[in-house]
Amino acid sequence: MRTISLFILALSVVFTTLPQPSRACTEARIKAEDGTVVIGRSMEFAQPLDSNIVVQPRGQVNVSTLPDGRDGIKWTSKYGVMYLDGFGIDVAVDGMNEAGLSLGSLFFPGAAQYQDMKGAKRSRTMVVNDLPLYILQNFATVDEVKEALPKLTVVGIHTPALQNIVIPAHFSVYEPDGTGIIVEYTKDGLNIYDSVGIMTNSPAYPWHVTNLNNYVGLNSVNAEPIVVDGVSFAATGQGSGLNGIPGDPSPPARFVRAAAMAYLAAKTPNADGAMNLAVHILNTVDIPLGTVRDFADKESFGDYTQWIVVKDLANRVLYFRTYGNTALRSVDMKKFDMSPGAKRFTMPVDGGAGAVTDVTAGLKPSS
């Protein structure tokens, strides 16, 4: 188990036969002055996710089916959960539980390597697709997760709904007070790192954190004019303090950009302000359809921002918007019965009334 110090933010090889193009996701933690913590996350992918929001009460009986078709670990959920699924399978791409624990599953291509089932106890073994729900349904704190994971064997499984690949993923876990960890399975085994509040994709988390050292000069204050040989040079316009911030959609660039925005932005007083700031930060990493491509073929499109979520961990509210409907919508977890035997609810994230509100009638005559 490894720990990385929180610094300036106070300031797998996967066993598949095909190469994995990088998929883009970005996550940022925002703390309001009143202590409220929100987690904002964008979800970029090329294949339509067709995600649903799922609300599932406590008492759900689960079993992880292993690659050989036999049963692995079994559990009954201790906590009600709210999450977004994907690809028509019951997998938690992102979500939180009624204790306010947040989990994010982000793509980790070329670096994720899961554990070997050989010699492992089946009763303590699960496929990686089930790990996010297992965490959300069983734990309330980061310490509980850190204690439980070394006792599990997590193996890969081919996913027919996603071109039969083994999904390469790494995970973030946050408590309502903002304490967070990053979980990665690599060739070195299980790695658990303290989170600096930002997450994207490959390479491994320590690389991204070290890379922030290259950008300690980023500043919200404009550069002062200088005089060289009697000639004065001054920055043109606003923003010269951020000169050099990477602007491309690659994972390293998005990590630095989100980190700088989260650290330098004006502090927000409460949950509403934190939610608003998280959305603005995610705007800076948004990927329009067609701007990122895996291949030159004009019919081939790469990643685009299919949806974003912002989770208010204190108030148990999930905000979301989609590529086709940029209006922000919300689901309040507190309004659902989470007792065992209560109903399970689902709703597609796509669709809705649309992002445009006609306010023509609001205009009044004036002198």
Identify the function of each model-found stretch.
Residues 1-6:
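Positively charged n-region of N-terminal signal peptides that target proteins for export
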Residues 48-49, 112-114, 181-184, 191-195, ...:
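Short helix/loop capping segments that flank catalytic or ligand/cofactor-binding pockets
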Residues 142, 146-185:
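Aromatic- and glycine-enriched pocket-lining scaffold segments that form the walls
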Residues 24-123, 156:
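A contiguous strand-loop segment
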Residues 23-38, 46, 52, 157-159, ...:
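C-terminus-biased signal that marks the final domain/tail of proteins
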Residues 45-47, 109-111, 188-190, 324-328:
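Short, surface-exposed beta-strand-loop junctions and turns on beta-sheet-rich folds
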Residues 7-17:
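Bacterial N-terminal signal peptides
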Residues 121-158, 271-280:
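Proteins synthesized as precursors that undergo proteolytic processing into mature forms
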